[in-house]
Curated annotation (Swiss-Prot):
It comes from the Eukaryota. The chain crosses the membrane at residues 23-45, 64-84, 129-149, 172-192, 221-241. It comes from Phaseolus vulgaris (Kidney bean). This is Protein TIC 214. Involved in protein precursor import into chloroplasts. May be part of an intermediate translocation complex acting as a protein-conducting channel at the inner envelope. Belongs to the TIC214 family. The lineage of its organism: Eukaryota, Viridiplantae, Streptophyta, Embryophyta, Tracheophyta. It is a multi-pass membrane protein.
Length: 1759
């Protein structure tokens, strides 16, 4: 087993070693390079398939393989790689290839040596194929960008050590891959031939085969295919031959090159010819006054011809990658990213090898090469001991030198010889060692620091002054060079300046230069400035001498002037300097190093449009824009303000025109991907990218398509597709439901305003698309402009007059008066104004510049609309304010239509002529309908009356007939009965009479008995009668039998007897039926009552309740929706509707009073399951549900029926309920209070509900009522006595808006009392521990405490909630003006003190606003550290609102400057400030201040209207500015400009934010033009925007609060008797003194040292303190809640109702209390902490959560 495992391990190790070997990796990468298929494969396949003969095929393969081998060799061999990589070397290789191709295609054989073997290697076709495949391998990187697979070898070559082995193995791998590839292609071709996919016997009409035709035209097809592939790849790369050449800016040193003698002579000849032409007699021509005759241009032209051929063909400095050009005005050109001259290298020093960063690179590389090849250059390694000895010796020498220097310096200081040389020895550069002639300190290169002088950092010259900079910049002072040449101190050979001027100095006679003449020349230069100096007056010779000047001397003189002038003048803008400045410039140029820079300085297309440079010279692409000229130099505007430049020069006409024009830029809104790219640069090489979407953000490679999120059509996940299919199926089933729901939602959600906005947005988008389409098509603007002008002419002079004629002729035919004059007047009123492409108005006659290329618009002012008739009505002088002004203009389209905006797709009404006719027809039809309706109405009413009368009459007749018939029937029946009775009586025998009488009596008796009252007696009687009847019947039967026996019966008697028997039977049957009916009736009467009850209940439950529920189900959401709609309409915000009204989920609340008042079913509320909303209703409801022994529940009836807070509870209820439950007793004073960490309320909850083990139904009862929930959510309720910050703000509680006044005051007082009572009731403490909670117990001493309602609370908290504030409310928030510090004190502490003295309040923390308690106490304790300014930070509030300052009778001083709302609560309109809009009518009034100039007046006006603004400068045009530009262009052309501008401003056509034209007087702010250094002069637009800043008090205010909290406890100390009662501070710095109150003095005397700890409960209000305590008590992990008094209970130590403890126990108590305080906040739950954070900072987000986190782990000071 061990042997097998060993073998396996060795095999795995061997396999891994083989896999990681260089040979295998090289084979792999070489095989991968076969996939980098290029154009060379096309020639190889062509030779293998088309060429005949094996020699051609072999030559193609050998050429292909040799080319690939040379490429692999070039990877390792650098010179070969450079030769094949550079473009000019490839062109050298391409020329012989073209020759081979030319000779190969010709039919002649040029290399025919008489050898007849066609397959010989001397055959030219074989050589051509070989070189063709060889050279196209080299062209592969040129035509195709380098492939990924080809780069594998280059990348891995740097990683391996044995590079030669790697290259050979990769080449072998490439050969293997190549053979596989070729065999695979052959296999494919054989399969195609065998399957007869290409048939050779297909005939065409010309009876030619396809293959033969293909073979003949194969070469042409191949050439076309090769050309297409090259074009495809060259489209991605700009070709180097035809790329745009960039303009070069010559470097400063190029001009000062050496000039040959012949060049100077040619220059002189040119000067002579020019002088002869000009016939100028002066000897010295001016050099600076006429720049075109300057000699420097000749040198520039000459230097252009001296460029090498390679730079002309291929510029190596060109931008060959998509670099972005970053402009920098401080530099001329971009610095090249080249290799530095210095390199880092190690060198041994002081026994150690150190790195030198300034080591020459060539030396380091040479040294490495020599070390590898020659053994002499190998450095012997020095041992460690030798190196250490050497370094120690050198260090000792250094130490000695330093100590000696220090000693000498101290000696010199003692001698009081102080100089710079004492403190530092410097090395100086010397000219002569014997005489010790040193260089000057400025020119000495060995000196450092301020001795060398300071170089002023200046900006480089601009692009316009480049030529002057080149011509005037001098590196060498040539006059100084002459003096140096004459001096004997410096040799000629060592002088570099002399060598540069040696050739120029040979051309003239040096004897002419006398020193006096030179000094005269210099003095003249020094007196006058160079710019105003005329050099034609200069003479080098004195006036008293007369020298005959030959032609040669004149030429020499000119050369002298040239050289000397160049030597002296340093800059045109500066005066000539002394020798010191010249020497300084020389030495700086010698020391400074030339920085390699690109020779290009690029300009944008926008700068070209702006006129900063000549046309067609831009090198960087910018956003597509066109220059739209608004005003030209012929206009009155330029002449009026003296800006018209009437220049006579004809050369710079374009520049002068641009200066005298006012133009704007019009940008196209198309997507521009070429922005800021240099022209001629290579684009991104993205060959292997695929786009499969219509709009795709990023381009991806197809290799990574699996990792990209794809659409459904490109995904292969079957599970997802099945899901989508099922969803579609469900959607098809529920299609009808979706339609109904969608229809309802659209009706409810969509408003008409949104639809209008959408329509406007769609129209605007269509307009932009049409405009861009016209702009993108070639020659479209020309066609459009011509069509517009033709349409204008046709409309004005053909179409409209013809319509007028037709209309008036028709009127004549209809016998109406024609309206020739009216129509002619309207036609004459119509005018056509030419506008730019964007619609900027010019004039009627003036066309915009380049309107054929840039585009044009034609605006029709007062367009003519043909009317069927004209109205003659007197116009009313009064106009309605709300009526909108009709637009009396339109734009003309190409089709001759009228459009409101240019390029709009919705034309105006074409049939406006028929509109009044249709209106008249509608009126007539309405009148006819009204008349017919009245007639039909009357007719229908009359007809109804007639029908009613007829029906009533018919009914009456029918009733009378029926009544008569009934009477007759009744009469006949009576008669019939009487007749039969008479017959029966006549023929009746005696016995039968008796029997019948008995029967009749029985019947009458039985009937009467039934009607009797007693039912039992009646039953007995009926039974007796029945028995009697039976007896009678029996007797009758016996008698009949006897008669039959006797035979005495007669026939008549038999007939009568039969009749009597039948009658008796009938009577019996009727009797039986009557009895049955009577029994049923009796039963029904008994059960009717219960049945009716049951029936009514069923109807009520099944029918009536359902009917009642239907309107409730439908009405309730309807009412709530109407409420929401009204709320939205009032506030204009959807969020308020969600805040104020939350619907009740229950629909039919059939519940009791308790359930109705104390159960809240709003489960969707965010306060659900929240303990913080425990209310009194919850307590009483749970008390009622709990079982209590010996308690009368009816005592709580009043509490339960009262649906709001019952603030005061009677003692009986307290004792019975609270005492039984263990909460508290009413007589708290006389009992021992349980001073526990967990209060009694928590104990009660814990005992009954086991902390959090509550059901959902119980948790649902923890919510308070709806109105209280809203109040706690939105803060303080409304009260007229409250000091409000924002008087315009409206309370979101719309329901309670009617309850303002006295009722609302009472409710707030009750609520405040209840808060205080509940807090003191639940969180009581004795006097000793009262500092923990910051209050006094309510039940200790002052029972009759009165809570004042005249407390000042702010409507908004200190830390306002910003998330739900609408932007209109937010912009009117308080913003502090930092610039002005007014002396107004917003807190009058003296007034507060007076109020305190007047009131008898034991606890000042509750009448004062609860949030300010801690700050007030802090300032009262130590007012020296914390001023009022830090506490409240009220500086000057620059707010535009109506100040309603309430006067106080007790105090005559003016109160706080905080703006209070008036009692009427007037709705103040807000001033909405929009971008680019001017001044609007404002309802606010501020007192005007006296301002000195007009500038300040207008700025004050802006400040007053817009409150906060800043000047924003943009290059684009907004709608409002564009509208102002239109109006402004028309106003400029008018004569009376001032009146028209005022009128246009009054009409609202022109805003006050119009643009400021450059170098002109401003119409709105004339003071701005006086300021020279104003930024407004640089830009051309002036925009006013409202500042979207957060409030200034947030940041500083929060910081001050947090810092003040820490300062409070640091400065707490004992108050001695010596402590001053008043602290006087300077009033100007917002400090004031505070007097101590009487209550405070008492507390200060009894105050002891307390732990230096911030109590978090002091931050909260009374209600929120209760919330905090409840949350802490309900926290399940709070195990420290031990009853504190259980340990220390001792009855003997109880004295007068309070517990006395020893000092030790007090210390223990303090420690426990400290532990409680420390673990109070950290043990708190994060959710609860966030809730408290939201309440305190009044916000919904956690942005200020970090401030609360400060109090999590505070620093505890232990006494």
């Amino acid at each position: 087993m061990i042997f097998e495992s060993f073998i396996l391990e060795n095999l795995v190790f061997l396999c891994m070693k083989i896999m990681n070997s260089i040979v295998v990796v090289g084979l792999y990468y070489g095989f991968m390079t076969t996939f980098s298929i290029g154009p060379s494969y096309l020639f190889l396949l062509r030779a293998r398939l088309v060429e005949e003969g094996t020699e051609n095929k072999i030559s193609a393969t050998t050429g292909f393989i040799t080319g690939q081998l040379i490429i692999f060799m070039s990877i390792y061999y650098a010179p070969l790689h450079l030769a094949l990589g550079r473009p000019h070397t490839i062109t050298v290789i391409a020329i012989p290839y073209l020759l081979f191709q030319f000779f190969g295609n010709s039919k002649k054989n040029f290399l025919n040596y008489g050898y007849k073997n066609p397959n010989s290697i001397r055959n030219f076709s074989i050589q051509r194929i070989f070189f063709q495949n060889l050279l196209f391998q080299f062209f592969n990187p040129l035509f195709l960008p380098s492939s990924i697979f080809m780069r594998f070898v280059n990348i891995y070559l740097f990683r391996c050590n044995n590079k030669v082995l790697f290259l050979t193995s990769s080449f072998i791998g490439w050969i293997i891959g190549h053979t596989f590839f070729m065999k695979w292609i052959e296999f494919l071709l054989i399969c195609i031939q065998q399957n007869n996919l290409i048939k050779s016997n297909v005939r065409i009409q010309s009876n030619k085969y396809i293959l033969s035709e293909l073979k003949n035209s194969m070469f042409q097809i191949f050439v076309v295919f090769l050309f297409v592939t090259c074009l495809y790849y060259l489209g991605r790369i700009p070709p180097p031959f035809f790329s745009k050449k960039l303009l070069e800016i010559k470097e400063s040193n190029e001009f000062f090159k050496k000039e040959k003698k012949g060049d100077v002579e040619t220059n002189l000849q040119r000067i002579r010819t020019k002088q002869k032409r000009s016939n100028n007699k002066d000897i010295f021509p001016s050099i600076f006054l006429k720049k075109e005759k300057n000699l420097y241009k000749l040198d520039e032209q000459k230097n252009k011809l001296q460029k090498p051929l390679l730079n002309i063909l291929f510029n190596y400095k060109r931008w060959n990658r998509p670099f972005r050009y970053i402009k920098n005005n401080q530099f001329e050109n971009i610095i090249k990213n080249e290799i530095s001259e210095f390199f880092f290298h190690t060198y041994p020093r002081n026994g150690r090898e150190k790195i030198y960063f300034t080591y020459p690179q060539n030396l380091s590389t040479f040294q490495k090469m020599m070390e590898t090849k020659i053994d002499i250059f190998t450095i012997k390694k020095i041992s460690y001991d030798d190196s250490s000895n050497h370094s120690s010796y050198s260090n000792e020498e250094k130490r000695k030198k330093l100590s000696n220097e220090f000693i000498t310096r101290t000696k010199l200081i003692d001698k009081e010889l102080i100089s710079l040389d004492i403190f530092e020895n410097r090395i100086r550069l010397c000219n002569d060692e014997t005489k010790k002639n040193y260089f000057t300190k400025i020119t000495d290169p060995f000196l450092n620091g301020p001795f060398r002088g300071r170089i002023k950092k200046g900006f480089s010259t601009s692009i316009q002054d480049e030529k002057t900079y080149k011509k005037n910049h001098i590196l060498i002072n040539k006059i100084q060079e002459i003096f140096l040449y004459n001096s004997k101190k410096i040799p000629k050979k060592n002088n570099r300046n002399y060598q540069k001027l040696e050739e120029n100095l040979k051309t003239f006679n040096k004897k002419l230069l006398v020193t006096t003449f030179l000094f005269n020349l210099i003095s003249q230069f020094s007196k006058k400035s160079v710019s105003s100096f005329n050099y034609e007056v200069l003479y080098l010779f004195p006036e008293h001498e007369q020298v005959k000047m030959n032609s040669n001397l004149e030429e020499e003189k000119k050369l002298i002037i040239k050289i000397l002038f160049d030597a002296i003048t340093t800059d045109l803008n500066e005066k000539t300097k002394g020798n010191r400045n010249n020497t300084k410039s020389i030495k700086i140029n010698e020391i400074c190093k030339k920085v390699p820079r690109w020779s290009y300085k690029f300009m944008d297309e926008l700068e070209e449009l702006g006129g900063k440079m000549e046309a067609d010279n831009s090198q960087i692409r910018s956003r597509k824009a066109k220059r739209v000229v608004i005003l030209t130099n012929k206009s009155k505007f330029f002449k009026k303000y003296n800006t018209y430049n009437d220049l006579g020069d004809t050369e710079n006409t374009e520049n002068t025109e641009k200066k005298n024009e006012l133009a704007l830029r019009r940008y196209s809104q198309q997507s521009d991907f070429r922005r800021d790219i240099i022209k001629g640069s290579i684009r991104a090489q993205r060959r292997k990218t695929v786009t499969w979407k219509f709009f795709q953000k990023r381009v991806h490679s197809p290799l990574f398509l699996d990792k990209i999120e794809k659409s459904l059509f490109f995904s292969f996940d079957t599970f997802k597709s099945m899901k989508i299919f099922l969803k579609l199926k469900i959607w098809i089933r529920k299609k009808t439901e979706f339609k109904i729901l969608g229809y309802i939602e659209e009706k409810t959600k969509k408003s008409p305003k949104k639809e209008e906005e959408k329509k406007k947005g769609n129209e605007e988008r269509k307009r932009i698309e049409i405009a861009e389409a016209w702009d993108s098509i070639i020659f479209a603007q020309v066609i459009r402009g011509v069509l517009l002008i033709t349409q204008c002419i046709i409309r004005k002079y053909i179409l409209l007059p013809s319509l007028i004629i037709i209309k008036n002729m028709i009127r004549i035919l209809f016998f109406q008066i024609p309206e020739w004059s009216e129509d002619y007047r309207d036609w004459k009123r119509e005018r056509y104004i030419k506008c730019t492409y964007n619609g900027v108005q010019l004039s009627e006659r003036e066309f915009p510049q380049k309107w054929l290329t840039d585009g044009i618009q034609i605006k029709i002012v007062f367009p003519f609309h043909l009317k069927p008739w004209h109205k003659y009505k007197i116009r009313c002088n009064k106009k309605k304010k709300d009526s909108k002004k009709k637009k009396n203009f339109c734009f003309l389209t190409v089709w001759g239509m009228e459009v409101e905006l240019p390029f709009s797709s919705s034309p105006k009404n074409l049939f406006s002529f028929f509109d009044p006719i249709l209106k008249e027809l509608k009126k007539k039809t309405k009148q006819f309908e009204f008349f017919t309706f009245r007639v039909l109405k009357v007719f229908s009413e009359k007809f109804k009356l007639f029908l009613n009368i007829v029906i009533e009459k018919a009914k009456w007749i029918i009733n009378r007939i029926m009544e008569s018939l009934k009477k007759s029937i009744v009469f006949l029946t009576k008669k019939r009965k009487e007749f039969f009775e008479s017959l029966f009586i006549q023929w009746k025998p005696k016995k039968l009479d008796e029997l019948s009488e008995n029967k009749i009596d029985e019947a009458t008796i039985s009937i009467q008995s039934i009607k009797s009252t007693n039912f039992a007696l009646k039953k007995k009687k009926i039974k007796d009668l029945n028995t009697k009847r039976k007896v009678v019947i029996k007797k009758i039967k016996k008698l009949k039998k006897e008669e039959k026996k006797r035979g005495l019966v007669i026939s008549e008697t038999n007939i009568d007897s039969n009749k009597t028997i039948s009658d008796s039977k009938r009577i019996e049957f009727e009797k039986k039926n009557l009895q049955i009916l009577k029994r049923i009736h009796i039963r029904l009467t008994k059960k009717s009552h219960s049945f009716l009850k049951f029936f009514i209940k069923k109807i009520y439950l099944d029918i009536f309740l359902y009917i009642i529920c239907i309107p409730k189900i439908h009405i309730q959401p309807f009412i709530e929706s109407t409420k929401k709609f009204l709320n939205k309409w009032i506030y204009g915000n959807e969020t308020n509707a969600e805040r104020t009204y939350k619907t009740n989920q229950s629909i039919i609340p059939f519940i009791s009073k308790l359930h109705k008042y104390f159960h809240n079913r709003n489960l969707n509320s965010h306060n659900y399951f929240d303990v913080s909303f425990l209310s009194q209703a919850y307590v009483f409801f749970n008390l009622l549900q709990t079982r209590i022994i010996n308690i009368n529940i009816y005592k709580l009836r009043l509490l339960f029926e009262y649906h709001k807070n019952f603030f005061f509870v009677k003692n009986k209820i307290k004792n019975s309920f609270f005492g039984a439950q263990g909460i508290v007793h009413s007589k708290l004073e006389q009992k021992n209070l349980l001073n526990s960490k967990r209060n009694q309320w928590t104990n009660w909850l814990k005992n009954h509900y086991y902390q959090y083990d509550l059901s959902n139904s119980r948790w649902s009862k923890l919510l308070s009522q709806k109105w209280r929930n809203r109040i706690t959510k939105f803060g303080v309720a409304q009260n007229p006595n409250l000091t409000k910050w924002d008087s315009y703000g409206k309370s979101p509680l719309i329901i309670y808006k009617e309850q303002q006044g006295a009722a609302l005051k009472k409710k707030i007082r009750k609520q405040y009392r209840y808060d205080l009572l509940s807090y003191n009731f639940m969180n009581y403490a004795n006097k000793k521990d009262s500092y923990i909670y910051g209050y006094r117990s309510l039940f200790q001493s002052n029972k009759n405490i009165w809570i004042s309602s005249n407390y000042n609370t702010y409507k908004k908290n200190l830390f306002d909630r910003i998330s739900n504030i609408f932007i209109k409310n937010y912009e009117d928030a308080i913003i502090i003006d930092i610039e002005k510090n007014s002396n107004r004190k917003y807190l009058d502490w003296m007034g507060i003190h007076r109020e305190i003295l007047n009131r008898s309040i034991s606890n000042p923390e509750f009448w004062f606003f609860s949030k300010f308690v801690i700050f007030y106490n802090a300032y009262r304790s130590n007012s020296q550290i914390i001023p009022i300014k830090l506490l409240y930070l009220h500086s000057k509030v620059s707010k535009v609102n109506k100040n309603v300052s309430e006067k106080n009778i007790t105090r005559k001083k003016k109160r706080i400057a905080v703006f209070r709302a008036s009692k009427k609560q007037e709705d103040i309109e807000k001033n909405s400030v929009a971008v680019g809009r001017g001044s609007e009518k404002n309802s606010y009034v501020i007192k005007k201040k006296k301002v000195k100039n007009n500038m300040e007046v207008e700025l004050h006006f802006l400040v007053r209207n817009f409150l906060i603004f800043h000047f924003n400068w943009k290059n684009f045009l907004g709608q409002n500015i564009f509208h102002n530009v239109k109006v402004y262009c028309l106003l400029i052309r008018l004569t009376n400009l001032r009146k028209m501008t005022i009128a246009s401003i009054q009409r609202g056509e022109l805003g006050l934010d119009i643009m400021i034209i450059q170098n002109q007087k401003n119409l709105t702010l004339p003071g701005l033009s006086k300021n020279k250094n104003n930024k407004l002069r640089k830009k051309e637009l002036f925009v006013i925007e409202p500042v979207r800043l957060s409030r200034k008090n947030n940041k500083q205010f929060l910081k001050s609060k947090t810092m003040d909290l820490s300062l409070i406890h640091k400065n707490k100390r004992k108050i001695d008797k010596k402590y001053l009662k008043k602290i006087h501070v300077n009033k100007k710095s917002f400090y004031k003194y505070i007097t101590r109150t009487r209550d405070q003095k008492i507390t200060e005397k009894n105050e002891k040292e307390i732990l230096n700890f911030l109590v978090p409960e002091n931050i909260l209000s009374a209600r929120r303190r209760r919330e905090l305590r409840m949350r802490i008590c309900l926290y399940p992990n709070n195990r420290n809640s031990i009853h504190r008094n259980t340990i220390f209970d001792n009855e003997n130590k109880v004295k007068k109702g309070f517990q006395v403890l020893t000092k030790k126990r007090n210390e223990k108590e303090k420690k426990k209390l400290m532990n409680f305080k420390i673990f109070l906040w950290p043990k708190y739950r994060l959710e609860d902490l966030a809730c408290i954070n939201r309440y305190w900072f009044n916000t919904h987000n956690g942005s200020r959560f970090s401030i609360v986190r400060i109090h999590l782990y505070p620093r505890v000071k232990i006494c």
